[in-house]
Amino acid sequence: MQPNIVLINCDDLGYGDLGCYGSEKNDTPCLDALAAGGRRFTDFYMASAICSPSRGAMMTGCYPPRIGFGSFHGEIVLFPGDCMGLHPDEVTMADVLKNAGYRTMHIGKWHCGDQKEFLPTSHGFDDYYGLPYSND
């Protein structure tokens, strides 16, 4: 039986903000329990400090400029109605997992394009429940 995979991406979360990573300030028992029963990344860094490039990079394993989300000095954040997004031909972790027999779902903020061809269901996710973007 294949293991379940749950990948949590949280904007503006510091390395020591959860109890499972040593926080004595924040009480996070549910996330701590989830971490205790699985794998944790202890050296995981995003490719960008802003939404669209970091999410696109995490989904594809590519640097933001490679997937069209700007240069290292002029990264692009997508906004509602933009006619660009993560190109449908890019291979995502959802594509790879689906090919390995997994059922995939994206929950939460996507921020890689809000047009139909850029949404999670066009990138290997079987289901999607969330926001295509936010303006924060």
Regions found by a protein language model. Give the residues of each.
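Formylglycine-dependent sulfatase
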Residues: M1-D136
